[in-house]
């Protein structure tokens, strides 16, 4: 979709004047960002890839994290524009680096949710109140932003999407494709993506990614509740 908007018929490449800067805040494959940037540059159009993290709550309150790839001078010029909607804006390297950073972010989030789901399912199956387990561990080394955001959702059975499983599958697929291209191995990412695909097959593709817990609950025949 981004390629079509940028390079397609009646796209940015056909209408934008030289000197225009495209700040692409979507989450796409790093290779796609580089290809789009190269085509635009031939027409005198610069580009930053600037995906965001934080989900709907941080978008609403203007505290998103923005990770940016592209020319540093262009980044500096438009920093204040991006900072107006963000809590942090970090230049991570050349074009495509923003989306590599976003993929790394999505890997960490997915694996955190999976680990949380395993732990709370274990507690529930062992007859221990998962809410008390959560309260006990959240202040220690196992505590995290993901744990605090997603554990209450699971225990309240609130899977209203802040970030849908469908979208996380897309990001993990891009992470795996990128890893194959650079020769990295992501075995845990591959495993979690299979779990999410199974949930999508069960009709949970539009649920919040915290519904990953349902995969573990189904195996253990329990429900993680307060």
For each of these PLM feature ranges, what is it?
Residues 1-9:
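Glycine/threonine-rich flexible loop motifs
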Residues 95, 99, 143-210, 215-216, ...:
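Interdomain hinge/lid region at the active-site interface
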Residues 129-138, 190-194:
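Beta-strand segments within the central parallel beta-sheet cores of soluble alpha/beta enzyme folds
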Residues 5-6, 22, 27-106, 110:
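Rossmann-fold dinucleotide-binding core
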Residues 61-69, 90, 94-126, 135-149, ...:
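Active-site-proximal catalytic alpha-helix in oxidoreductases
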Residues 12-18:
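Short, conserved loop/helix-junction motifs that constitute active-site signature segments
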